[in-house]
């Protein structure tokens, strides 16, 4: 994406319909609601992806799993939503914190740039968030995701193990205890109060951060690239395809009657632009970071000591399938990420612009 064009001075880096700036509460709540909706709706994609990626942790005699086989193992439809609670907690809290951190970084940097040069135009036609350069989008997304990703790492591991069928946790307590102890025999003892009345010794809180490096190696580049491509699609490419209603009306004499199918009012146009940009950006970045996701899942499901990204990578490449193992579950992740991004970013962008949110929190 090119640098923001120069134009007449713009007094506000971020403005709403009331001329005020959304505070942190608005971004936090809008992000949390967006994350909550997408997490509950798309949990089946995450569950099936996790089970496809865990396959080589089972015995070597087992037949290679497929999506069809995993679906047949499910006895009830609601089993597809196993792990929804930790997933919802992770996504809603994570999305709220991420959107808040990202918006604060972007607006603060935008205000700093305008304090140096008031002629810079940072206004976006479809969003109240400032329009930055490609490198600034990449950097802010990378840093914001790194901070929030590490904070929410314990919930991420609980979510991953709930989705797996290697750990049959029946409650959040069992999940937290099992990860803390990280020993299957001790996990079984916890489930039987007559054997063990509580969490015994030998546990470690470090277990809640297993796979942190792989997770951040996946999420930070993903987030940085995502913000970069999302802003590029939103501000530069898609507006060329979806015309502005005022532009269409002014040139209506030269347009055929069929062109009216592609004319949208400002609110609908911004929603379509934001959702389309989110889906395209998510699909691009998901494919690029797929190997890190496969490694992260394997690390968080194994109990082996001294596991590292390099060790797991070599092991996965030696297994049947070779390099294809690094892209196991990609189609499910593409589907989930694409739809999730379309839902969450559209909801987020529209909520922070809505009159209701403005009247309540501004």
UniProtKB/Swiss-Prot annotation:
It is found in: Mitochondrion inner membrane. One of its GO terms (molecular function) is glycine transmembrane transporter activity. Keywords: Membrane, Mitochondrion, Mitochondrion inner membrane, Repeat, Transmembrane, Transmembrane helix, Transport. Solcar repeats lie at residues 22-108, 132-236, 269-354. Its main location: mitochondrion. One of its GO terms (cellular component) is mitochondrial inner membrane. The chain crosses the membrane at residues 28-53, 83-109, 138-163, 211-234, 273-299, 329-347. It is a multi-pass membrane protein. It catalyses: glycine(in) = glycine(out). Mitochondrial glycine transporter that imports glycine into the mitochondrial matrix. Plays an important role in providing glycine for the first enzymatic step in heme biosynthesis, the condensation of glycine with succinyl-CoA to produce 5-aminolevulinate (ALA) in the mitochondrial matrix. Belongs to the mitochondrial carrier (TC 2.A.29) family. SLC25A38 subfamily. This is Mitochondrial glycine transporter. It comes from Candida albicans (strain SC5314 / ATCC MYA-2876).
């Amino acid at each position: 994406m090119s640098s923001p064009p120069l134009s007449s001075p713009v007094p506000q880096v971020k403005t709403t319909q009331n001329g005020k700036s959304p505070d942190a509460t608005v971004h936090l709540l809008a992000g949390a609601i967006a994350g909550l909706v997408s997490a509950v709706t798309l949990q089946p994609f995450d569950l099936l992806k996790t089970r496809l990626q865990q396959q080589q942790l089972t015995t070597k005699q087992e037949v290679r799993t497929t999506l069809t086989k995993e679906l047949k193992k499910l006895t009830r439809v609601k089993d597809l939503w196993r792990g929804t609670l930790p997933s919802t907690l992770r996504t809603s809290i994570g999305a709220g914190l991420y959107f808040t951190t990202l918006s604060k970084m972007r607006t603060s940097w935008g205000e700093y740039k305008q304090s140096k040069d008031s002629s810079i135009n940072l206004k976006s036609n479809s969003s109240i968030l400032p329009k930055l350069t490609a490198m600034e989008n990449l950097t802010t997304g990378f840093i914001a995701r790194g901070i929030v990703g590490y904070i929410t790492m314990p919930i991420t591991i609980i979510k991953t193990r709930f989705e797996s069928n290697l750990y049959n946790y029946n409650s959040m307590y069992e999940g937290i205890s099992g990860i803390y102890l990280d020993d299957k025999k001790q996990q079984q003892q916890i489930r039987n109060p007559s054997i063990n009345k509580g969490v015994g010794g030998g546990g470690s809180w470090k277990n809640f951060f297993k796979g942190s490096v792989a997770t951040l190696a996946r999420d930070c580049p993903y987030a940085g690239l995502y913000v970069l491509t999302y802003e590029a699609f939103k501000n530069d490419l898609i507006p060329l395809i979806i015309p502005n209603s005022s532009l269409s009306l002014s040139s209506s004499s030269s347009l055929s009657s069929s062109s009216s199918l592609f004319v949208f009012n400002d609110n609908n146009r911004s929603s379509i632009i934001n959702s389309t940009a989110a889906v395209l950006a998510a699909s691009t970045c998901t494919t690029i970071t797929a190997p890190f996701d496969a490694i992260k899942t394997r690390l968080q499901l194994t109990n082996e000591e001294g596991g590292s990204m390099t060790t797991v990578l070599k092991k996965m490449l030696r297994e049947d399938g070779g390099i294809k193992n690094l892209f196991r579950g990609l189609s499910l992740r593409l589907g989930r990420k694409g739809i999730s991004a379309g839902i969450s970013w559209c909801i987020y962008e529209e909520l922070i612009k809505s009159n209701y949110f403005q009247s309540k929190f501004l």
